[in-house]
From Swiss-Prot:
GO terms for biological process: lipid A biosynthetic process. It catalyses: a UDP-3-O-[(3R)-3-hydroxyacyl]-alpha-D-glucosamine + a (3R)-hydroxyacyl-[ACP] = a UDP-2-N,3-O-bis[(3R)-3-hydroxyacyl]-alpha-D-glucosamine + holo-[ACP] + H(+). One of its GO terms (cellular component) is membrane. Keywords: Acyltransferase, Lipid A biosynthesis, Lipid biosynthesis, Lipid metabolism, Repeat, Transferase. CDD domains: LbH_LpxD. Homotrimer. This is UDP-3-O-acylglucosamine N-acyltransferase. Pathway: Bacterial outer membrane biogenesis; LPS lipid A biosynthesis. The keyword Transferase applies. Belongs to the transferase hexapeptide repeat family. LpxD subfamily. One of its GO terms (molecular function) is N-acyltransferase activity. It comes from Nitrosococcus oceani (strain ATCC 19707 / BCRC 17464 / JCM 30415 / NCIMB 11848 / C-107).
Length: 347
């Protein structure tokens, strides 16, 4: 495939610097790109790498254009996004199977499968399921009774949707995702042990959500567990029963969210964050990696640590800890001098 740089610029709505007729035959990171390949630059950490790059053209922000004088450039207000748009438009190699239901798939009664859907080998679709247009189920997926799948969804192999799950449009679920399993609900019943609390709720996943490998989203005990429009959930995340995640939030790998916690819009939970149950995280908040959250977090706060605290407070506390060794030396010296004085006075 060969595309003129001017075609890419027109598609993106970007200004060009340099020869717009230059051919682009591929995409690559800065340090690997060759003369016919397109790359992008957003992070000044890689400035030296960018200057040495052999890329045929680079997508850059307006504030960075001067350091690339003489290079072929596309000037963008969001270089990373626009690079992704180019990849999606011309270089996306994602495999999509042909429409149809594989003969080994098991389809229950009263199932509605719309046009142009693809149901892969050994999928199991229980009674009363609705699958809307252009949705793809790769092999070995399970869809529980009365589940609804929206249009243009993509379920990779071994995705499990238990009963009464509701999935919006353009949702992507990666291998091993389990949605709608029982929440962790057990009533103490001594001396016998615990009585299992029936989990009779469901899960609602809004449009444009992506959930990556081996993540579990539990059904509500009563009522729904909800994931808001456009939110992205990484690998190995646990979402407890009746959790609500707002729109366009980012949940990074190995996060654990306990039951009934409410997470706002545009929130970021970095890797291995843990949340206790029944707390609220305000819109736009950021929780840094490995933080432990046991209380509500206000909107737009940046929090860190375990227990979690505002980032600046945490940095001051760490600075004080780093001074303790020197302080300990001073205290020991004072103790030594005091001992000498006491010995002198006793003579």
């Amino acid at each position: 495939m060969e595309i003129r740089l001017s075609e890419i610029a027109q598609f993106l709505g970007c200004a060009i610097e340099g020869d717009g007729e230059a051919p682009i035959r591929g995409i690559a990171p800065l340090h690997q790109a060759q003369a016919s390949e397109l790359s992008f630059y957003t992070n000044r950490k890689y400035a030296a790498q960018a200057r040495l790059s052999k890329a045929g053209a680079i997508i850059v922000g307006a504030k960075d254009r001067e350091q690339f004088a003489g290079r072929r450039l596309l000037i963008s207000d969001n270089p990373y996004r626009d690079f992704a748009r180019v990849v999606d438009r011309w270089f996306n190699r994602s495999y999509r199977p042909a429409p149809g239901v594989h003969p080994t798939a098991i389809v229950g009664d009263d199932v509605q499968i719309a046009e142009n859907c693809s149901i892969g080998a050994y999928c199991v679709i229980e009674d009363g399921v609705t699958i809307k247009a252009h949705t793809v189920l790769f092999p070995f997926c399970y869809v529980g009774a009365k589940t609804i799948l929206g249009e243009h969804c993509l379920l990779y192999p071994r995705v499990t949707l238990l009963e009464r799950v509701r999935i919006g449009h353009r949702v992507i679920l990666h291998p091993g995702v389990v949605i709608g399993g029982d929440g962790f609900g057990f009533a103490p019943d001594p001396p016998q042990g615990y009585f299992k609390v029936p989990q009779v709720g469901w899960v609602e996943i809004a449009d444009d959500v992506e959930v990556q490998c081996n993540t579990a989203i539990d059904r509500g005990a009563l009522g729904p567990t909800r994931i808001g429009q456009g939110s992205k959930i990484d690998n190995l995340v646990q979402v407890g029963h009746n959790v609500e995640i707002g729109e366009h939030s980012i949940i990074v790998s190995q996060v654990g969210i306990s039951g009934s916690s409410k997470i706002g819009n545009w929130v970021t939970l970095a890797g291995q964050v843990g949340l206790v149950g029944h707390i609220r995280i305000g819109d736009g908040a950021v929780i840094t990696a490995q933080s432990g959250v046991a209380k509500d977090v206000p909107p737009k706060a940046i929090m860190t640590g375990s227990p979690v605290q505002p980032m600046m407070e945490n940095r001051r506390a760490l600075a004080e800890l780093n001074r303790l060794r020197e302080l300990r030396k001073k205290v020991r010296e004072l103790e030594r001098r005091l001992t000498v004085l006491e010995q002198v006075e006793s003579c």
